[in-house]
Amino acid sequence: MNAQLKQLWTKTLNIIKGELTEVSFNTWIKSISPISMNENTIKLEVPNDFTRGILESRYKDLIINAIKLITSKKYNIEFSITSEEIFNNQQLKPKSSNDNIVVNDEMTSILNPKYTFDSFVIGNSNRFAHAASLAVAESPAKAYNPLFIYGGVGLGKTHLMHAIGHYILQNTPNAKVVYVSSEKFTNELINSIKDDKNEEFRNKYRNVDVLLIDDIQFIAGKERTQEEFFHTFNALYEADKQIILSSDRPPKEIPTLEDRLRSRFEWGLIADIQAPDFETRIAILKKKADVENLDIPNEVMVYIATKIKSNIRELEGALIRIVAYSSLTNREISVDLAAEALKDIISSEQNKQITIELIQDIVCNYFNLKIQELKSSRRTRNIAFPRQIAMYLSRKLTDMSLPKIGEEFGGRDHTTVIHAYEKISNILKKDESLRNVIDDLNKKITNN
């Protein structure tokens, strides 16, 4: 940026600042960087496509008029997206099997620069998974191999996988680190078969130091993909190369996954991530506000954390939605404004808040039992069968892991939960009276 443009932009900001609320200015204008200027046009760089759209529709004329006040000339304004954002967007586009980013002439993955260990918020719900990921990053193929991370959508699995990749590349720049989704792995395999490039495909995934595969559950039911990944896994494992996998469920719960793969996924360490607790949700919101340079009142963060409980993605999305709503309505951020901005999300979120405790209460009332009896070690049919029904419903209606469900039923093992789920599922196939009971309980739980 030349001195003339820098001086002009500083004066322009001073004019615009007097026309907007502080929130609108900080959200939309402050992030703009002037990059070039010629006789008729000034080019401005913005952080993302969403911001560009808002600036084009709402603030472009304001910027043009502010510059005209200073220069007495009407310049054309062009917005472009920062090179980092373009790079990130390219990561999301499908690529051919030969379309790789090369660092030091070695094949590597494309990792999101925002997903590092430093930007990961640690809480009780993810502390173990974070520690395991860091251990693997510090000592690839020596600490835990494979590392299997599982948890619900938007809880930070992908963040940890990218963080592992970043850490390894920072400390060993020449390492071959490949990150890929299981869907892309499958698509590349199909293309390699179609184009008769099987050997090229195998070389790509078997000659690496670290392989990170996201959403591995999607290879279930795909026989050829499972066959290929089985041999890829073996080749890497035998060569002492690190394998990191993520899934929305533990290996035991992935349906139609071959037993030989299931057993290999369990060779190393399995770490789960749960939904963040209240304190962690507050910490996540504060971190997001700091990163985005947002001034959010503490009581608004408490409101968001109280209402949005399911995952990190929805938490951060709620924060951005409130800021955008404040800017578009020209109002200061407050709890009342937050309630307006999030009314649709909160309604949906509240509908999803089915807990194991709620299921236990309703099942106990239905069968005239006490909670202590449901959690006890007693195995009489009048207690054991309702307990199995409650476990079945907990598995169907919540995102809790099998170990967590077992823990809520008197500290039982996850295999007990599996047995209960399978038993009730089998009876439901032939027993209409039980189907009616389950339907009735379902209605009571979801309408509660």
Swiss-Prot record:
Pfam families reported for this sequence: Bac_DnaA (PF00308), Bac_DnaA_C (PF08299), DnaA_N (PF11638)
Record-level GO cellular component terms: cytoplasm; plasma membrane
Segments for region (Domain III, AAA+ region): 110-326
Keyword vocabulary terms for this entry: ATP-binding, Cytoplasm, DNA replication, DNA-binding, Lipid-binding, Nucleotide-binding
Main subcellular location: cytoplasm
Binding-site positions, ATP: 154, 156-158
An MF annotation (GO) of this entry: lipid binding
Leader sequence segment: none
Subcellular location: Cytoplasm
Any one GO biological process: regulation of DNA replication
Database matches in SMART domains: AAA, Bac_DnaA_C
Region of interest called Domain I, interacts with DnaA modulators, as start-end residue ranges on this chain: 1-73
Keyword DNA damage belongs to the record: no
SUPFAM superfamilies hit by this protein: P-loop containing nucleoside triphosphate hydrolases (SSF52540), TrpR-like (SSF48295)
Region Domain IV, binds dsDNA, annotated ranges: 327-448
Segments of this protein annotated with the region Domain II: 73-109
Subunit details: Oligomerizes as a right-handed, spiral filament on DNA at oriC.
UniProt xrefs under PANTHER family: CHROMOSOMAL REPLICATION INITIATOR PROTEIN DNAA
Recorded domain comment: Domain I is involved in oligomerization and binding regulators, domain II is flexibile and of varying length in different bacteria, domain III forms the AAA+ region, while domain IV binds dsDNA.
Role, per record: Plays an essential role in the initiation and regulation of chromosomal replication. ATP-DnaA binds to the origin of replication (oriC) to initiate formation of the DNA replication initiation complex once per cell cycle. Binds the DnaA box (a 9 base pair repeat at the origin) and separates the double-stranded (ds)DNA. Forms a right-handed helical filament on oriC DNA; dsDNA binds to the exterior of the filament while single-stranded (ss)DNA is stabiized in the filament's interior.
Protein name: Chromosomal replication initiator protein DnaA
Species of origin: Clostridium novyi (strain NT)
Gene: dnaA
